[in-house]
Design a protein with these regions (language model features):
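Extracellular, beta-strand-rich glycan-interacting domains
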Residues: 1
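Extracytoplasmic
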Residues: 4-14, 19-202
């Protein structure tokens, strides 16, 4: 590792026994573990696990409909932007594990000219709660000041928490979605994360 920190040199012929051990271990893992995993994971996102009072629903794990785009192809630290139409949607196909009342908090940024829009939380087409964006919060991206070369991953920024009225969730499948209405200035919010904190258990 010290002589070749970038690991560019093939040293398998210098260490044939270790090389064969690694090949055997990989083959065993593929047969015993990888073979049991689906090529496409269709499991629903777990929401409201009984052992955890707060569920995090990040942009990283969400899907979208419409013109909303991710800040970067790499999901970690990414956020959603270019949210311009009422038909646009951010959603999670989830599974509620514990029924109850939950307090949503949305982490967003919004330019001054876009203040006044309404954010809706829904299950499929049923509105669970909604609120108006009354406060502008529009900090710049940061992180590039620490880079010696341009990073491939998303830059980050600070986010403003917005507390919404509690919502009632029943146990079972759910398609939890965010939509925007009364969009001002041709743009809704940038979105990073929604949390759901359990306040009452059914």
């Amino acid at each position: 590792m010290e002589k070749d920190p970038s690991q560019e040199q093939d040293v398998s012929s210098d260490y044939p026994i270790i090389h064969q051990q690694l090949i055997t271990a990989k083959s065993k893992w593929e047969k015993e573990v990888l073979s049991e995993l689906p090529k496409i994971d269709e499991r629903n996102f777990p929401i409201a696990h009984p052992d955890f009072p707060i569920t995090q629903l990040p942009a990283r794990d969400a899907k979208t409909i419409g013109g909303i785009i991710r800040s970067n192809r790499w999901p970690n630290c990414s956020f959603y932007t270019s949210w311009k139409k009422e038909e646009d949607k951010i959603y999670w196909k989830g599974e509620v594990l514990t029924a109850g009342q939950y307090q949503p908090v949305i982490y967003y940024t919004c330019a001054e000219e876009n203040v006044g829009l309404t954010i809706n939380i829904s299950d499929k087409n049923k509105i669970l709660t909604r609120t108006k964006i009354k406060e502008a919060f529009h900090p710049p991206l940061r992180g590039m000041e620490y880079d010696k070369i341009e990073r491939g991953e998303s830059y980050v920024k600070d986010w403003n928490p917005l507390v919404l009225n509690p919502i009632s969730l029943s146990k079972g499948p759910i398609e939890l979605a965010l939509t925007a209405s009364d969009i001002q200035g041709g743009q809704a919010i940038d979105f990073r994360l929604m949390t759901l904190e359990r306040v009452v258990t059914k």
